[in-house]
Design a protein with these regions (language model features):
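Gly/Pro-rich interdomain helix-loop hinge
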Residues: 305-349, 353
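Single conserved hydrophobic/aromatic residue that forms the stacking wall/gate
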Residues: 1-15, 347-358
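Predominant activation on well-ordered alpha-helical scaffold segments within soluble catalytic domains
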Residues: 47, 73, 86, 101-104, ...
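Glycine-rich phosphate/pyrophosphate-binding beta-alpha loops
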Residues: 175, 285-294, 299-308
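ATP/NTP phosphate-donor binding region
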Residues: 20, 25-114
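Carboxylate- and glycine-rich phosphate/diphosphate-binding segment that chelates Mg2+/Mn2+
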Residues: 180-290
Length: 358
């Protein structure tokens, strides 16, 4: 709309059209570890891995107590390089900054060229943070923990990784997908806070998704971690940063969860456990590139404040978040059509909101 007015003897023309700055777009990308091994017995890769001389294993006490660390050291001892091995087995659930600092001190003393993260999300996340500060002692934790919308556009830039050591992640639960993601969640329990760190530099170099490590996981952990997988896949699928590559992975992970989680929980069937282990990794690749949503934001706050298991917190929230996102209001137009398309295959309802609520 053009408007005019007379000022003195001159005509002044004002252009009242809204001016919008051109949005700077990054090229689309899809980033995952260099190698992913994913069959029973795939831990044997460690016996063949080249260029390893000093290996530090980061785990929780249970990994040492129940012999999982022994499975790893057995393969390392078969390696032609005969690497020296250091074990740090003090990672607790929701690893604290103090634990990370303690692990970094051990790394600085031992000087590993390979770090093996063995365990659930806590061990893998702690190992990533230790790796970060081992490689970059002057890294700014406050800057790295800053909030952001797009991981590629924030002000703080993570330092380069891999100058001193490679990261190998071996998950022993089927939930976090941390073995293939660019995320690490570190707690400050003195403040009841969780800090999600996110940058593609945190992506492990190698993931070993060996289902033999999850055959005996207890039923409760199987349920909680399985629902975490489902939440990862659903949130990645309806993310505003989703794309053709992440959609394919997210949808397949959802199908695997619905088909195999009940049997994995009820009978510990080996095939079901293997499929859920794959689903966890597949969902991890999806959300590492499409990112997550309000469900995980709230779950991290709940976990930080009340120390609820992460998968359980997600399970509490997921039905409510789906219903909230399923309302076709102007601020959420990106989400509900993608929910509705597949939910309508299961429920016949007169509107997207009704089918999503069902």
């Amino acid at each position: 709309e053009m408007t005019s007015s007379l000022v003195g003897s001159e005509m002044c023309i004002r252009d009242s059209r809204k001016k919008v700055a051109k949005r700077r777009l990054n090229m689309q990308w899809f980033k995952i570890p260099e190698k992913i091994y994913f069959e029973p017995g795939s831990v044997q890769y460690l016996a063949k891995m080249p260029d390893m001389h000093r290996v530090m294993i980061v785990a929780d006490p249970g990994m040492l107590q129940f012999g999982y660390v022994d499975r790893v050291t057995y393969q390392l001892n078969k390696n032609a390089n005969q690497p020296s091995i250091e074990i740090f087995s003090e990672v607790e659930p929701d690893p604290d900054l103090t634990t990370v600092r303690k692990g970094v001190e051990v790394m600085n003393s031992f000087q590993p060229d390979v770090i093996v993260a063995l365990g659930g999300g806590s061990a893998m996340d702690a190992a990533k943070a230790m790796w970060l500060f081992y490689e970059n002692p002057d890294a700014d934790f406050v800057g790295m923990a800053q909030k952001f919308m797009d991981i590629r556009k924030r002000i703080y830039k993570f330092p380069k990784m891999g100058k001193k050591a490679k990261m190998v992640s071996i998950p022993t639960t089927s939930g976090t997908g941390s073995e293939v993601t660019s995320f690490a969640v570190i707690s400050d329990k003195s403040k009841n806070m969780k800090y999600p760190l996110a940058d593609y530099e945190l992506t492990p170099d190698i993931a070993i998704v060996d289902p033999e490590f999850v055959y005996t996981v207890p039923k409760g952990s199987t349920a909680f971690t399985g629902l975490d997988v489902l939440t990862h896949a659903i949130e990645a699928y309806v993310s505003i940063l989703a794309n053709d590559y992440t959609d394919a992975l997210a949808l397949h992970a959802i199908k695997l969860v619905f088909k195999y989680l009940p049997k994995s929980y009820a009978t510990a069937d080996k095939e079901a456990r293997e499929k859920m282990h794959n689903a966890s990794c597949i969902a991890g690749m999806a959300f590492s590139n499409a990112f997550l949503g309000v469900n995980h934001s709230l779950a991290h706050k709940l976990g930080g404040e009340f120390h609820i298991p992460h998968g359980l917190a997600n399970a509490y929230l997921l039905p409510h978040v789906i219903e909230y996102n399923g309302q076709p209001t102007p601020t959420k137009l990106a989400a509900w059509p993608k929910y509705d398309h597949y939910i309508c295959l299961l429920y016949t309802s007169p509107s997207p909101r009704d089918s999503t609520s069902s």
